[in-house]
């Protein structure tokens, strides 16, 4: 991308760093990971979890959510000002699962948020360590992306449910900062903007007064984030137009919907980071591994190496398939919800199935589910190869924007074609050619029409053996070019409900 030089790397966003060299970045990311690990160890001690219970992903999720809730200042302030019955705004908690007499039992724990904040800061050398909190948010977001389809959210804002490959990060909280903005898909940004514009249409005062000024700044900032994800001049010019509109309304909503559709072929650059559950970092720290000294990267070999040697367990419901549960978590750990299944399967070394073929529900267990028949099993999170995570969107050099199937946003920098059903996508563009942006629209449509599904993206890029940490010998896989590999295709995954 031309503007690469002006952007901070993911790791810098992740650690709030100014410009750092690679070694400093690796060290500061390592420091962040080590802090999460130390916090997790301390929480397991507080909760009296044994080693097995501490490696249970459901316990990890509860502990992670407790720390996020403890630091959610806006919500905490809101809860204190609007007390609701039976909810103590100063406390946080959730289900913790323990083995008792050969059965899994659920125990609801409650802690002072102040106490959780103290433990977190202590694990992070006295800092608030916002980067670590964001890292946990992105892990939760990646898990949601893998588990749920956002069709309902798309339909509500007037977008096509088949555009789910653009929805990465759609469940990230607003407070997730620059690192969070980097991993949001084009569809997610469009959705946020459309919601905002709709509020403005329905509420006369939304853009007015002191609050309205802040709203306007937020609107323009979101527009700029989205603009930065687009890689063609015409798409960016359209974003300028949306941003500069005096009074955003239906015309802007149409432009944004058009841009979202165009991103199925002229894909945006969306970052991918491997964020692992706290129960992976904890045991690694406990075994004496020094993340800060060794250095760590979220986009290289490190997460793969860590998963190779980690033992993580999960609770399994009676009719769930443990192998399918493993695939769900593997995809979340590798941020691969919208990657081509051909590529994921090659890297994992076992076939990765589309969501609709998986016999598994989400990882979390609802408080009303019966624990009697619930068992636990080891999650298989290892991989055969590793590959570098990308944020380019895989557009080919010829027109810097190429084939995108109606459902991929590449995660790994690995050579392949990106098959897509051009007729389906182009059909969405017939009709509405009038309007003030017809010249840019025409240019975008022309670029899309010239894109060919058989064109190869990530030319010459391959996967690497796990022993090849310096990425010296790329193994370029050959894929069946006609075969498309989209995860949510023709699917019946559950909807994500807050």
UniProtKB/Swiss-Prot annotation:
UniProt xrefs under InterPro entries: Flu_NP (IPR002141)
Annotated motif Unconventional nuclear localization signal, positions: 1-18
Modifications the protein undergoes after translation, according to the UniProt entry: Late in virus-infected cells, may be cleaved from a 56-kDa protein to a 53-kDa protein by a cellular caspase. This cleavage might be a marker for the onset of apoptosis in infected cells or have a specific function in virus host interaction.
Single GO term (MF): RNA binding
GO biological process: symbiont entry into host cell; viral penetration into host nucleus
Biased composition (Basic and acidic residues): 8-21
Segments for region (Disordered): 1-21
The keyword RNA-binding belongs to this UniProt entry's keyword annotation: yes
Main location: virion
Short sequence motif named Bipartite nuclear localization signal, residue ranges: 198-216
Record's keyword terms, sorted: Capsid protein, Helical capsid protein, Host nucleus, Host-virus interaction, Ribonucleoprotein, RNA-binding, Viral nucleoprotein, Viral penetration into host nucleus, Virion, Virus entry into host cell
Pfam families tied to this protein: Flu_NP
GO cellular component terms, semicolon-separated: helical viral capsid; host cell; host cell nucleus; ribonucleoprotein complex; viral nucleocapsid
Subcellular location, record wording: Virion; Host nucleus
Family statement drawn from the similarity comment of this UniProt entry: Belongs to the influenza viruses nucleoprotein family.
Subunit structure: Homomultimerizes to form the nucleocapsid. May bind host exportin-1/XPO1. Binds to viral genomic RNA. Protein-RNA contacts are mediated by a combination of electrostatic interactions between positively charged residues and the phosphate backbone and planar interactions between aromatic side chains and bases.
Protein function: Encapsidates the negative strand viral RNA, protecting it from nucleases. The encapsidated genomic RNA is termed the ribonucleoprotein (RNP) and serves as template for transcription and replication. The RNP needs to be localized in the host nucleus to start an infectious cycle, but is too large to diffuse through the nuclear pore complex. NP comprises at least 2 nuclear localization signals that are responsible for the active RNP import into the nucleus through cellular importin alpha/beta pathway.
Protein name from the UniProt record: Nucleoprotein
Organism: Influenza A virus (strain A/China:Nanchang/11/1996 H1N1)
Taxonomy of the source species: Viruses, Riboviria, Orthornavirae, Negarnaviricota, Polyploviricotina
Gene name as annotated: NP
């Amino acid at each position: 991308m031309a503007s690469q030089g002006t952007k901070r790397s993911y790791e810098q966003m992740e650690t709030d760093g100014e410009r750092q060299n690679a070694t400093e970045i690796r060290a500061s990311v390592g420091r962040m990971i080590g802090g999460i690990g130390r916090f997790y160890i301390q929480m397991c001690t507080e909760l009296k979890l044994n080693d097995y219970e501490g490696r249970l992903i459901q316990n990890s999720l509860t502990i992670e959510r407790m720390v996020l809730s403890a630091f959610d200042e806006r919500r905490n302030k809101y809860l204190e000002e609007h007390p609701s019955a039976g909810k103590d705004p100063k406390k946080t908690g959730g289900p913790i699962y323990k083995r008792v007499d050969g059965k899994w039992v659920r125990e609801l724990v409650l802690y002072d948020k102040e106490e959780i904040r103290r433990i977190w800061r202590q694990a992070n050398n006295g800092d608030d360590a916002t980067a670590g909190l964001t890292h946990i948010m992105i892990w939760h977001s990646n898990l949601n992306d893998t588990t749920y389809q956002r069709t309902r959210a798309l339909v509500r804002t007037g977008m096509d449910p088949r555009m789910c490959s653009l929805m990465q990060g759609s469940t990230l909280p607003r407070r997730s900062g620059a690192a969070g903005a980097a991993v949001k898909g084009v569809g997610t940004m469009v959705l946020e903007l459309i919601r905002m514009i709709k509020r403005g249409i329905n509420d006369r005062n939304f853009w007015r007064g002191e609050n309205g000024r802040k709203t306007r700044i937020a609107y323009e900032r979101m527009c700029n984030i989205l603009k930065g994800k687009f890689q063609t001049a015409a798409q960016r010019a359209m974003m300028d137009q949306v941003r500069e509109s005096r009074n955003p309304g239906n015309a802007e909503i149409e432009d944004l919907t058009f841009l979202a559709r165009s991103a199925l072929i002229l894909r945006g650059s969306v970052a991918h980071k491997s964020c692992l559950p706290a129960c992976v970092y904890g045991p690694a720290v406990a075994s004496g591994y020094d993340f800060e000294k060794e250095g760590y990267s979220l986009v290289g070999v490190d997460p793969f190496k860590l998963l190779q040697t980690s033992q993580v367990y999960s609770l399994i419901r009676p009719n769930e398939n443990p192998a399918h549960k493993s695939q769900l978590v593997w995809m979340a750990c590798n941020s691969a919800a919208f990657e081509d299944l051909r590529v994921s399967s090659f890297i994992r070394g076992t076939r990765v199935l589309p969501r609709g073929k998986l016999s598994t529900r989400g990882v979390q267990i609802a408080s009303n589910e019966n624990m009697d028949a619930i068992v636990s099993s080891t999650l298989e999170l290892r991989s055969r190869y590793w590959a570098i995570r990308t944020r380019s969107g895989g557009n080919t050099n010829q027109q810097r924007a190429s084939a995108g199937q109606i459902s991929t946003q590449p995660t790994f920098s690995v050579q392949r074609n990106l098959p897509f059903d051009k007729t389906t996508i182009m059909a969405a563009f017939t009709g509405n050619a009038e309007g003030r942006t017809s010249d840019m629209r025409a240019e975008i449509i022309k670029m899309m029409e010239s894109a060919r599904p058989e064109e190869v993206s990530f030319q010459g890029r391959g996967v690497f053996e796990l022993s090849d940490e310096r990425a010296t010998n790329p193994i370029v896989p050959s894929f069946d070019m006609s075969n498309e590999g989209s995860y949510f295709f023709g699917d019946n995954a559950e909807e994500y409900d807050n």
